[in-house]
Structure formats: structure tokens, C-alpha cells
């Protein structure tokens, strides 16, 4: 039998009851998945259960049943989305069917997915990235004496573009059940520096933060009319004058955190086309950095991406991007 070493200096701690251990573990498991992800996974499970009921199949996720589900769903939605559905199904059914992940990786299921991608696959339609000309168009549309909400809108737009931020990191979701105050940036975390001219604030949590440590967002002044530094300072002055005691960094004229609908509705006034949306901020900033010759590893770090998937945000054909960087076509030799 193993015993605690006599040299050990373990602090004295009160023992927990079994009920408390179970309760605390349940709470920890609840925090393991974000609310928005839980909603998506539950939706995927509901689709699977509906499929099983419709076809009188057992719920047991065998390779046969999963492959049938893939074929059926791929004829109704984009096959690329089916993989996400399978991930959600595995996450929700694993406590009841421990072998579900192994079945998901089986040759039958993986080949069925590959076949559906080839049979039903369609080109991916991505939102257009913002350019500096687009940003200038937004600023030109603002009145000479902008309101607080005008200042907020421009500050969010320019900050999101230059810091490669997701719109969801700057505003609240439209659904109240998905809103989490632990994810929003607070006013007291803001630091403004004159030398060098830049501002920063703390982002408590984001999609790529696997350790839940948060990140400090830093945005520097640039010599362009679309400089984010001056716009942020103008917004901050207005915000502090109206709501000096409110803790949230981003606040509308009503004293509430802006929602996605609040931002998109203002964006639609300037860009009626649905080619532009929240992703246009992040993809526009990433494309701008790539055009400036910034190393891809640095772009990944600035955007806080946890994998190489960030490359899809650089919305520029590699041939065109190379020509822009070196000033000549890719196959043209130097004279």
C-alpha cells in the first residue's frame, strides 16, 4: 500500500463529501463546453435523433447508422457541415455510447463523408474582406459631428479590422441565452500610450483560447485616414463622459453592450450587399497584413488562431498576392 512520504509538506485541507465531489465535478463538466457550442451540438443531436425516428433506426451510433445519416443529411445541407454535425453527435452521445468516436472514424463513415463531399460539394461562399477603401467609405458616411453611437461603430470597425478580431469578441450575441459577461472586455483594462502611440485592452476569452487565460489586444496608430488610434480615443472620451461608472468597455448611447444586430444593421446602411458581414473585419485585417508582407506565423499570432486554418481568412489569390508583394508576375524573371 502506498503512503504519503514523511518529508511531504501537504497543506491541511478539509475533506469533501461524496455529494460535493459529484456536484463540483458536474459544474466543471458544464464549463468544459461554451454555451454557443453546446447549442450547436444539441442541434446536431436533434437532427440525428429525428433521422433515427424517421427511418425507424436504433439510436445506437453504429458505423452503419452514422453512414446512413451522412448520406441523408448531405442531400439536404452542405456536405462540409456534416462533419460539424458528427462532432456534435459524438460529444453528446459519448456518455451513453463510449464507442461513438471510434465508429465516427471508421472506414465506412469516413469514406461515406468523402463520397458525399465529391458528389454534393459546392464552392464555399465566403464574406468579402474589408479593404482600406471600404473603411474610408464608412468614415466618410459619418456626419461631421458624430454621435456617440457613430463613434462606437467606427471604433469597433477599425479595432476589429486592425486587431484581427471576431465580431463576437466585440459585441454581444443577439440571443440573450448566449450572452456571457465573462467574455466582454472591461474599461479598467484599457491602457493608452502616447510613446509609442497605441492602445490596448484585455480580451478575457475567445474561441481559440484553450487555456482560458485571455489575451491583451494591442492596436497601434498608423499614418492613414483610417487610423484606429484616434477613433478609439474619440470613442473613449465620449464613453467616459456618458458612463463613467459602467464597467463595460463597449457601450451604446443607451448604456448597454452593443449586439451583433446593432452593428450589422448599421453596416447594412452603408453596405446593403450581404457580401460584407462580421467576418469581413477579421479577413480584411488578415489580407491587409499579408499584402504588407507580414510573415504568416505573425498573422496567426496576431489573430490568435490556434491552427493553420487562419489561412482561409487571407482572401487573396496566392498568385495575385505574390505579384503585389514583389511587383512582378510569379513566372516573370528579374531583368
Language model feature labels by segment:
Residues 1-335:
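Extended, non-catalytic subsegments within catalytic or DNA/protein-binding/adaptor domains
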Amino acid at each position: 500500500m502506498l503512503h504519503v512520504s514523511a518529508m511531504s509538506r501537504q497543506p491541511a485541507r478539509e475533506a469533501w463529501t461524496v455529494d460535493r465531489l459529484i456536484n463540483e465535478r458536474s459544474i466543471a463538466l458544464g464549463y468544459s463546453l461554451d454555451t454557443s457550442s453546446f447549442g450547436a451540438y444539441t442541434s446536431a443531436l436533434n437532427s440525428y435523433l429525428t433521422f433515427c425516428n424517421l427511418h425507424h433506426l436504433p439510436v445506437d451510433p453504429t458505423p452503419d447508422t452514422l453512414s446512413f445519416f451522412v448520406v441523408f443529411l448531405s442531400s439536404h445541407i452542405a456536405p462540409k457541415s456534416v462533419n460539424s454535425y458528427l462532432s456534435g453527435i459524438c460529444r453528446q452521445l459519448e456518455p451513453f455510447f463510449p464507442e461513438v468516436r471510434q465508429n465516427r472514424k471508421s472506414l465506412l463513415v469516413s469514406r461515406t463523408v468523402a463520397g458525399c463531399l465529391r458528389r454534393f460539394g459546392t464552392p464555399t461562399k465566403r464574406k468579402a474582406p474589408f479593404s482600406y477603401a471600404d473603411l474610408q467609405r464608412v468614415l466618410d458616411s459619418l456626419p461631421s459631428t458624430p454621435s456617440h453611437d457613430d463613434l462606437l461603430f467606427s471604433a469597433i470597425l477599425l479595432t476589429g479590422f486592425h486587431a484581427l478580431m471576431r465580431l463576437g469578441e466585440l459585441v454581444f450575441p443577439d440571443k440573450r441565452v448566449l450572452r456571457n459577461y465573462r467574455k466582454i472586455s472591461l474599461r479598467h483594462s484599457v491602457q493608452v500610450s502616447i510613446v509609442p502611440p497605441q492602445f490596448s485592452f484585455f480580451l478575457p476569452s475567445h474561441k481559440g483560447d484553450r487555456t482560458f487565460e485571455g489575451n491583451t489586444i494591442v492596436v497601434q496608430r498608423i499614418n492613414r485616414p483610417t487610423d484606429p488610434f484616434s477613433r478609439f480615443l474619440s470613442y473613449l472620451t465620449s464613453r467616459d463622459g456618458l458612463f463613467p461608472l459602467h464597467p463595460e468597455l463597449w457601450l451604446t448611447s443607451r448604456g448597454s453592450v452593443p449586439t451583433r444586430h446593432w452593428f450589422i444593421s448599421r453596416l447594412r446602411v452603408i453596405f446593403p450587399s450581404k457580401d460584407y458581414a462580421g467576418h469581413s473585419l477579421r479577413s480584411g485585417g488578415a489580407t491587409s497584413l499579408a499584402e504588407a508582407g507580414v510573415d504568416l506565423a505573425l498573422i496567426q499570432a496576431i489573430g490568435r488562431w490556434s491552427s493553420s486554418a487562419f489561412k482561409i481568412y487571407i482572401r487573396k489569390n496566392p498568385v495575385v498576392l505574390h505579384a503585389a508583394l514583389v511587383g512582378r508576375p510569379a513566372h516573370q524573371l528579374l531583368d
